[in-house]
């Protein structure tokens, strides 16, 4: 996320920056305090159902949320419908957010629950049991403000092709990779979103990376002028 943009929307108290300048607390502690203040401001605004705040949150998180839903569903039309429904839930149930956790963790949890609900309504397998993507699942393109660690690692690959490769992974592996490398959540935060034990999250991340490597190698080998690995 663009931290400069966030600072324009949610300003931390002056006392935090003053304390940093005097050196009484570390920069990391100051950043933590700023995030906590931002979360508290969001929680306060959501309890009041502030429409201006919702517009600001959509502007800040729209690309990340839609990308996450695209990876979970593999279908743009479905992802866009769930995108709208997620923000409706945020507005209607905003009082449930207490500001103790990062807002994006709470946001992705809502989105994931909607995907699971839709799967059940359509008599599909649950998210934890879905098989690999079918033939109707297509690669996608979505604008992002800055490259993630995974995108930087794969900077020489076509975005649509990378999306296609990720859609070939088992959904539970794909989800953890997206949350870790695209959304940059910590392993503990991923455990919160997926409601899985931390040990399970670590295992899925390891297995997902192991499964991704040969697929990426096949993608590079299929190119007539494949570049050397980074």
Where are these regions (language model features)?
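Helix-turn-helix DNA-binding module
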Residues: 160, 164-200
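C-terminal edge and immediately downstream basic/flexible tail or linker adjoining helix-turn-helix-like DNA-binding
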Residues: 2-15, 125, 129, 141, ...
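Arg/Lys-rich amphipathic alpha helix in sigma70-family domain 2
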Residues: 92-99, 109-130, 155, 207, ...
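A short, charge-rich alpha-helical start-of-domain segment used by transcription regulators
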Residues: 33, 43-67
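Sigma70-family region 2
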Residues: 47-48, 74, 85-102, 121
């Amino acid at each position: 996320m663009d931290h400069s943009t966030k600072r324009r929307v949610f300003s931390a108290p002056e006392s935090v920056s003053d304390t940093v300048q005097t050196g009484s607390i570390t920069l990391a502690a100051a950043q933590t305090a700023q995030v906590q203040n931002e979360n508290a401001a969001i929680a306060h605004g959501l309890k009041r159902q502030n429409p201006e705040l919702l517009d600001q949150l959509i502007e800040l998180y729209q690309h990340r949320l839609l990308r996450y839903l695209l990876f979970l569903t593999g279908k743009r039309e479905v992802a866009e419908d769930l995108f709208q429904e997620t923000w409706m839930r945020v507005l209607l149930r905003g009082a449930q957010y207490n500001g103790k956790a990062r807002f994006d963790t709470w946001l992705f949890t809502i989105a994931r629950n909607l995907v699971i609900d839709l799967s059940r309504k359509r008599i599909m397998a649950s998210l934890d049991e879905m098989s690999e993507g079918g033939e109707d699942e297509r690669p996608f393109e979505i604008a992002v403000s800055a490259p993630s660690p995974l995108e930087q690692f794969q900077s020489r690959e076509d975005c649509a092709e990378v999306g296609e490769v990720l859609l070939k992974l088992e959904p539970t592996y794909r989800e953890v990779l997206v949350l870790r490398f695209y959304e940059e959540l910590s392993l503990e935060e991923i455990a919160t979103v997926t409601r899985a034990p931390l040990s399970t999250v670590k295992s899925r991340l390891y297995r997902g990376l192991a499964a991704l490597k040969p697929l990426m190698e096949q993608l590079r080998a299929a190119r007539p002028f494949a570049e050397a690995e980074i």
